[in-house]
UniProtKB/Swiss-Prot annotation:
Regions of compositional bias (Acidic residues) in chain numbering: 1541-1555
Tissue: Ubiquitously expressed with higher levels in the head (at protein level). Expressed in the germ line, with prominent expression in primary spermatocytes and meiotic spermatocytes (at protein level). In ovaries, expressed in nurse cells and in the germinal vesicle of the ovarian follicle at stage 10 (at protein level).
Any one biological process term the GO annotation gives: apoptotic process
Stretch list, region Necessary for interaction with His3.3A and His3.3B: 870-1659
Name of the molecule in the record: Daxx-like protein
Length: 1659
């Protein structure tokens, strides 16, 4: 996967920084023992751990030599990204072919004062001149799953003015031209095979933490002369005996810093020479071997150490360890343990022990190659024994030789060690290693087992002592003896830690103690035998063991190369160290491994010392001058770094079997585990120990090379020690990752290795496994900070040409040479060390730590699916050349970081340089996907000095973050020389809605198989504020397929969210074997808790991103979901959609789980679906029943809504026919559910098949006795109700015999009554309402009038009476309200209001009754079809009935109007009508009389006929026409229309009228109206108020439409008929009277109109 680079820009002060933070910023070197974060950047000290592993006690290398307190460094689970921190990813160029992510953190001191960091430095990005071109690698090949992080002093990254010497694979030293910028490649083993391994290994991301210039200056000053001399000599490839281990270490440190590639190459050559070890070449990379080889001719050293490591070392060391080593190592182990205890660092102790071994093996130690071989041989024997023990023994063996060597040398101390080392040559080591055979190693290992047990106690004591002594040793380089004491104390403390771990790993500890004891007894013998045994074991055996160890763990891999190197110098040293470690324990072995590869360990220690302080540089020069001095320095370095070195070694050993033991010492649990692993892998452990030793040797060699390369001892060698301490923050117990362990074992050498070339895990095993996360352990290995970093050989530079992670580069934007460390005399104290870290993924399964080439763009890390959403591209830095700036006087600001200028996120405006001080990360929800892209920025890079300060701050922050990164180790990163760098600004966010993002996802899905194949990788994703503009240039997407999170990860759609979220958030995702682990950490909100107080944190895998989100309600049942789908299909309107998403969903989840899962409810849903299908137009009606049922259940919220849905088969649905009764009688068959707090749910499901109901209990949990009894009663009632329901159904179908006193009808009523009682009881037990299902029992709420008091009174009256109210009741209520509330309503107004209220309340009650009736009837009819739909005759009859319905409505309306009239008004109307009729009758009579008179006169027949016709006309005229209309005003102002009803036919007889009257009389006071009547009323007879008093218009009244067609006949009884004109729709205009012609013929008989038509309509 493409590696990401984190640039941490720690502005001096930001608004967010508290005084405490400012103090930490001002005094970063201030001792932070409680928190164990001394070396971390001040801003990052608050970052909580990432639970990468148990916190390791790391010796913090301070600028001052007095800094001895161990710092417990625990990787941060969550990385707190302070303001100004940007995270970027590099393309192919950024990452080495090994696939390591380059993470560079560089801090440069712009100010001479220590408070320079506090100054507000604009986070302007500086284009760092690096030859590297920043480009995202497009290769899809996934780098190794593990990311190795090694700390590298930023100054080392810089090119030193003098020519760097490059070691050719053939152990040739090739001087690099000054003009060429030096890239720091991972340290290659003395044999070139390591370089090959580098290609395999992912490039380690080097986190460089430059120490304050003052400390660096001191270290450089002390170590400078010696390191320069030795560097040049060693670089020259001279196999000069190192005057002292200190010199070797110094030289190695110098070489490591300036010539890290050379040391890497040397180590690689050594590895190649080691033969089978080339894969394990990291073992030969052990610092001690390179150191000796460097002091000795480096050329032979690569060859010899590699060969002896591969051959004689495995054999000889094992033999001596098996035989003489156990004997000698016992005393030496004790002595060594004591000096190791005295010596803070194991490496120091080892050197010291080697010096005593020099005493014991004075001749051998004098020829470093020979004596070390001899000494290491016995340790190898012990190592072999420990190798037999594998995990524990390997560690113990290494520690035992360290103890043996350290004890005797501790007594003799640096002088003897130096002498012995000088005496001991590669030849001696090789010879002894050759002499030592596997048998001897095994014997020694067996002896070591016994010794280990004894040594447990000694080691525990010594570890305690070591802890104290290590700190003491850190102080003075010149005091070898006190340092020896310190290492002893440290060893004691470490031994105690180891013993604790060893106690945990009983076998490993016993084995370790035994080898230590045997080694103590046979210190020299073991040393000799072990080399011999190792030689006997043969390089292949050691290689095999290293391979096995590599397979077993990174520690073994690392130990194997170390063993290979130790076969030459490393084996003797390892043996001597192992002999020393028998007493000191595995810590001493590790320290001895550091010491054993005297040069490597010295290099480590010198690197650590360089990292720690100039004092360590001085120690290294002293070691160069005196092996004893170098050992003292190593011891002091180890003491200073006892936490750093020993913890690192212990961490590495914990990772490796020996590293596990060291970690066990550091972390008793881890150490014990590591020791147990070592016990399991004793042979492998020997190989691992040898690897550790060889790695320290390789590291030492690399360190010496670097020291030689670093004649500028002033360079931040000591500041790198702080880096080491930072690197060692926590050793993780991952022996599985040999790469990580190897890289971690030697902070200096691994850094050099990482810088010089791909670091082999065996070389780094000495580093603590702090950063190594289980399979993705990260260790910050610190390369010696060589300010005078000579131009690293192009080879070295080439492997690490990949620019550091863009984010590191961005914030380090300081050009590599931008900040040259001023001469130590001139440099002000560095407030914060500047470090460059390169994160290189390390393969989890690979035993040899070979950084994989990061294929940035194309490679999709397995974690990418979750984390690769945000990707930032590094800026290409072309402004400065790494080679141009001399690194002697200035800290290297991080070769990787400087390689690329800081990358600015869109979160900060590109034009605002100060924006970097603000947090650039956003706290985005876990569902947020961010895809950064690069766009050229117009803003110039920030000034160099500010960039340097920013880099320092960023370096610290990034280092801490890297520590928190799982599966990442820190390795040095080389910067490719470039005259100028282009800044690229990433555009951060792509929304899922964007087409580009969709294409991106498709591409990622295509590459998903590649990710699955790749091992777990660590991805650092910067969650940036989403930019408003889409990304312009998008390189090949790195984001993995959106696996599970694909659906859950959602981009932040709104800019408001992005603006609101200003806190940085880091998403750390690790993918292991296809398992996605995603963690989103809000770094600001996480409290700063000391690691000791923090509980172990783990990253629980999030198998489904949805699970991480808040719990959601269970899905709908299948029936209910089908119902919702059907509703959407039937009605696709938005209203239905709102209903489905609203009430239907809310009510469902608010109802009890027992109810929604019950058979009754599911049956109800099924029936509703059937009805909706048959009557789709009534979909809302049918849904209402379901909603009412759910709503009724919502009343009681007894049960939680989140429910688990059992399979549908669990609650079989009976056919709908089994539910014949309405809801009032048959309650839904639902399982009883009892969910007590904290208890499981009890569900009782009932099957409806038989009369005997079966009850199914689901997840029955422990419930109280009371609940069980209640539950049992409920189930009993349900059974009874079910049986009664069946009986009711049978009785309804039975014939009724009215003569039978106990007829089926009576039985039916009794059963129904009993069913209702049972249902009410069930409701009581379940706490539900008894009447929730009866519409009639629901209260009404009248709100239609404008008077609230009246509304409430009327509603209360109706609900209380449970009867249809009367109009007068309504009117009385209104009158009462008017009187009480003084509404001031007139009588007519009250009548109108009461009338309206009466009608509306009546309709409400009527609708309720209809619904209830419909529910009851439909229960019987079920889903039957309407017979009228298939029978046309029935349909016609129904229509005719509807017509008659209109007539009935008219009658009702007529009498309703008449009811409104007073009796007086009615009487007056009648009188007036009579008078009118009388007048009319008189007129008619007069006409008739005139005609009669005419009859008396003679006339013709024609005239007679005319007269008869006239008389007939007069007689029928008044009745037929009814034209005489008079207007009369009633007292109440109503207009009465009096018309002669002559149109009534004979059909309207008294019988018909009687029938109508009888029909009307049948209505009771409650005014019940049938359903059909009320419906017709609502349609045909709209109600209107009476005519206003002012209206006086003539209205012609017509009785009915039919009147015109009927003969005009008055009613026989002359009875008034009051008809409603409105209902008849027969109003005519007054002018119609003109058209009617009155009959002129008078009628002798007056006709009285018998109908008065009163119209209330307005004309």
């Amino acid at each position: 996967m493409s590696a990401s680079v984190i640039c941490v820009d720690l502005s001096s002060e930001s608004d967010e920084e508290s005084p405490a933070k400012r103090r930490r910023l001002e005094d970063p070197l201030r001792l932070l023992t409680p928190s164990g974060r001394q070396s971390f950047p001040a801003k990052l000290l608050n970052i909580p751990k990432a639970s990468l592993g148990s916190a390791m006690v790391v010796p913090v290398a301070e600028t001052g030599p007095a800094r001895e307190t161990p710092v417990i460094v625990d990787p941060l689970r969550s990385m707190h990204i302070p303001s100004g921190i940007t995270i970027t990813k590099h393309q192919k160029n950024v990452l080495a072919t090994n696939g390591n992510m380059n993470l560079s953190l560089a801090e440069s001191n712009n100010n001479n004062n220590t408070t320079s960091l506090n100054k507000n430095v604009t986070p302007k990005q500086i284009n760092v001149g690096t030859g590297q071109k920043v480009a995202w690698s497009v290769s899809s090949k996934a780098p190794s799953p593990n990311a190795v992080i090694t700390t590298v002093p930023s100054h080392q990254v810089r090119v030193t003015p003098f020519n760097p010497i490059r070691l050719a694979p053939g152990s040739k030293i090739i001087p690099a031209s000054n003009a060429m910028p030096a890239k720091i490649q991972p340290i290659l083993g003395m044999g070139q095979p390591q370089q090959q391994a580098q290609a395999q290994q992912p490039k380690a991301i080097i986190v460089g933490f430059p120490k304050p210039n003052t400390a660096v200056a001191q270290m450089a000053q002390h170590q400078k002369p010696l390191t320069l001399q030795i560097h040049q000599k060693l670089i020259a490839g001279q196999q000069q005996h190192i005057a002292s281990i200190s010199q070797l270490q110094q030289v190695s440190l110098q070489q490591q810093q300036p010539l890290r590639p050379v040391s890497i190459q040397l180590q690689q050559q050594q590895n190649q020479r080691n033969g089978s070890l080339p894969g394990k070449q990291q073992k030969p990379l052990e610092c001690p071997v390179p150191a000796q080889q460097e002091k000795l001719p480096r050329g032979p050293l690569p060859t010899k150490p590699a060969e002896p490591l591969s051959g004689p070392l495995p054999t000889e060391p094992d033999e001596p360890l098996g035989g003489p080593l156990p004997t000698r190592p016992k005393p030496p182990v004790r002595s060594l343990q004591q000096p190791v205890n005295k010596n803070t660092a194991i490496g120091v102790q080892i050197q010291q022990s080697q010096e005593p071994l020099g005493g014991t093996l004075p001749t051998r130690q004098k020829p470093l190659g020979g004596q070390l071989l001899t000494q290491q041989k016995p340790p190898v024997g012990s190592i072999q024994q420990s190798v037999k023990q594998n995990t524990g023994i390997g560690v113990q063996i290494q520690q035992i030789p360290k103890v043996v060597v350290g004890q005797q040398p501790q007594k003799v101390y640096l002088n003897k060690l130096q002498q012995e080392q000088q005496k001991i040559f590669l030849g001696h080591l090789q010879q002894q290693q050759q002499k030592t055979f596997l048998g001897q190693l095994q014997q020694e290992q067996q002896k070591i087992l016994g010794q280990l047990q004894q040594q447990k106690q000694q080691q525990q004591q010594q570890q305690k002592k070591i802890l104290g002594q290590s700190q003491q040793q850190k102080v003075p380089l010149g005091q070898p003896q006190p340092q020896q004491k310190l290492p002893q104390q440290l060893n004691n403390s470490l031994v105690q830690l180891q013993q604790q771990h060893q106690q945990r790993t009983s076998v490993g500890q016993l084995q370790q103690q035994q080898p230590h004891q045997s080694q103590q007894k046979n210190s020299m013998v073991h040393v000799k035998q072990q080399p011999q045994q190792q030689k006997k074991i043969s390089v292949g055996q050691f290689q095999q063991q290293p391979q096995q160890q590599q397979k077993t763990s990174v520690a073994q891999l690392q130990q194997q190369p170390q063993q290979q190197q130790k076969i030459s110098v490393g084996q003797l040293q390892q043996q001597s160290q192992q002999q020393q470690k028998p007493s000191v324990g595995q810590l001493q072995q590790q320290s001895q491994q550091q010491q054993t590869p005297l040069v490597g360990q010295l290099q480590r220690q010198t690197q650590q010392q360089q990292k720690t302080s100039a004092g360590q540089f001085q120690q290294q020069p002293q070691q160069q001058q005196k092996i004893s001095a170098g050992q003292l320095q190593e011891h002091s370095q180890q003491q200073q770094k006892t936490l750093a070195g020993q913890l690192q070694q212990q961490a590495q050993q914990q990772l490796n079997t020996s590293a596990g033991q060291l970690q066990q010492q550091q972390k008793p649990p881890k150490a014990s585990l590591a020791q147990q692993a070592a016990a399991q892998k004793q042979g492998a452990g020997l190989g691992q120990q040898q690897q550790f030793q060889s790695q320290p040797q390789q590291r030492t060699s690399a360190g010496l090379l670097q020291q030689q390369q670093m004649p500028q001892k002033k360079i931040v060698m000591q500041p790198q020690l702080p880096k080491t301490s930072v690197v060692l923050p926590r050793p993780q117990q991952l022996p599985k990752n040999p790469l990580l362990v190897a890289q971690q074992q030697s902070p200096k050498t691994p850094l050099v290795n990482s810088v010089m070339g791909p670091q082999f895990p065996s070389q780094q095993p000495s580093l603590p496994v702090v950063n190594q996360i289980t399979h993705k352990s990260m260790t910050i290995q610190r390369l010696p900070m060589l300010q005078t970093v000579q131009k690293i050989l192009p080879k070295q530079i080439a492997p690490q040409q990949t620019p550091p992670p863009a984010h590191i580069v961005q914030k380090q934007t300081m050009p590599n040479a931008a900040m040259q460390n001023p001469p130590f005399a001139h440099r002000p104290p560095i407030v914060r060390p500047m470090t460059v870290a390169k994160i290189s993924p390390v393969p989890t399964n690979n035993k040899v730590c070979i950084p994989m080439k990061p294929q940035m763009a194309s490679y999709v890390s397995p974690t990418d699916p979750t984390m690769t959403a945000a990707r930032t591209l590094p800026f290409r830095s072309s402004q400065r050349k790494t080679s141009e700036a001399p690194m002697t006087s200035t800290h290297v600001q991080g070769f990787t970081a400087s390689a690329t200028p800081p990358q600015r996120l869109l979160a900060t405006p590109p034009h605002c340089a100060a924006a970097l001080n603000e947090p650039l990360l956003l706290n985005l929800p876990p569902t947020t996907s961010i895809t950064p892209q690069l766009t050229p920025t117009t803003t110039p890079p920030p000034a160099g000095p500010s960039a340097a300060v920013q880099q320092q701050q960023l370096a610290k922050a990034a280092a801490i973050k890297l520590n928190s990164l799982p599966e990442a180790s820190i390795s040095p990163v080389n910067r490719s020389p470039t005259a100028s760098a282009k800044r690229i600004q990433p555009i951060t966010v792509l929304k899922k809605s964007d087409e580009e993002w969709q294409r991106h996802l498709e591409q990622q899905q295509q590459k998903k198989h590649v990710q699955l194949q790749s091992s777990s990788m660590t991805t650092i994703v910067l969650v940036e504020s989403p930019p408003t503009t889409p990304p312009t240039d998008k390189p090949e997407p790195e984001r993995g397929p959106m696996t599970v999170e694909k659906s859950s990860i959602k981009p932040m759609a709104t800019d408001k969210q992005s603006r609101a979220i200003k806190r940085p958030a880091v998403m750390i995702s690790t993918k292991k074997s296809g398992l996605v682990v995603t963690e989103i950490v809000d770094l600001d909100e996480i409290p700063d808790i000391p690691p000791e107080k923090r509980g172990k944190e783990c990253f629980p895998p999030i198998k489904n991103a949805a699970k991480a989100a808040p719990s959601v309600n269970a899905p709908f049942t299948t029936e209910y979901a089908a119902l919702l789908r059907l509703c959407r299909e039937v009605d696709k309107s938005t209203h239905m959609e709102r209903l489905v998403k609203g009430e239907l969903t809310q009510y469902y989840y608010s109802a009890p789980e027992s109810f929604v899962m019950s058979c009754g409810f599911r049956n109800l849903v099924t029936m509703a679906m059937a009805r909706i299908r048959s009557e789709s137009y009534l979909v809302y009606v049918h849904l209402k029943y379901v909603l009412d049922e759910l709503a009724s259940r919502r009343l009681t919220k007894m049960f939680p809504t989140v429910r688990a849905i059992p399979p549908a088969s669990q609650f079989p649905l009976p056919p709908a026919s089994q539910f014949p009764l309405p809801p009032t009688l048959t309650t839904p068959k639902q399982p009883a559910i009892v969910k007590a707090p904290g208890q499981q749910t009890v569900m009782a499901g009932r099957e409806q098949d038989d009369e005997v109901e079966e009850v199914t209990l689901v997840n029955v949990g422990t419930v109280s006795c009371e609940e069980r009894r209640r539950d049992e009663r409920i189930r009993h009632f349900y059974r009874t109700l079910h049986a009664i329901t069946k009986r009711i159904k049978m009785l309804e179908e039975a014939e009724v015999d009215l003569n039978d006193e106990d007829s089926s009808y009576l039985q039916l009523e009794r059963f129904k009554k009993r069913a209702c009682q049972i249902y009410e009881k069930i409701c009581d037990l379940k706490g539900e309402s008894k009447s929730v299902r009866r519409q009639l029992k629901k209260p009404i709420h009248f709100k239609d009038s404008d008077y609230p008091h009246f509304n409430n009174s009327l509603s209360a009256f109706v609900n209380r009476m449970q009867d249809f109210p009367d109009y007068h009741d309504v009117l009385q209520i209104l009158e009462k309200c008017n009187k009480e509330k003084e509404l001031g309503l007139a009588k007519y107004e009250m009548k109108r209001i009461a009338y309206d209220a009466f009608n509306k309340v009546g309709r409400m009650l009527q609708s309720r009754r209809k619904n209830d009736l419909y529910e009851t009837v439909t229960h019987y009819t079920a889903n039957g079809k309407d017979p009228a739909s298939s029978d046309p005759e029935l349909l016609a009859k129904l229509k005719e009935n509807n017509k008659k319905q209109t007539k009935i409505s008219d009658i009702l309306e007529k009498y309703a109007l008449e009811q409104d009239l007073n009796a007086e008004e009615r009487q007056e109307a009648r009188l007036k009508e009579k008078k009118l009729k009388q007048v009319k009758a008189d007129e008619e009579a007069a006409k008739l009389a005139a005609l009669a008179e005419d009859d008396d006169k003679p006339c013709t027949s024609a005239q007679a006929a005319a007269k008869a016709a006239a008389l007939a006309a007069l007689k029928r005229g008044p009745a037929a026409r009814g034209n005489v209309i008079r207007k009369k005003r009633a007292a109440n102002g109503r207009i009465f229309k009096i018309a002669d009803d002559g149109d009534d036919s004979e059909e309207e007889s008294d019988s018909e009228d009687d029938d109508v009257e009888e029909f009307v009389n049948n209505f009771q006071a409650n005014s019940d109206v049938s359903d059909a009547d009320s419906e017709v009323e609502a349609v045909t007879s709209p109600k209107r108020d009476a005519l206003p008093l002012a209206e006086e218009e003539d209205v012609i009244d017509i009785t009915r439409d039919e009147t015109g067609k009927k003969n005009d006949e008055g009613t026989p009884n002359g009875r008034l008929k009051i008809m409603s004109v409105s209902s008849l729709n027969a109003n005519f205009v007054h002018g119609q009277d003109l058209h009617r012609k009155p009959n002129p013929m008078p009628s002798a008989k007056p006709v009285i109109a018998d109908q008065i038509i009163i119209s209330d309509e307005e004309s």
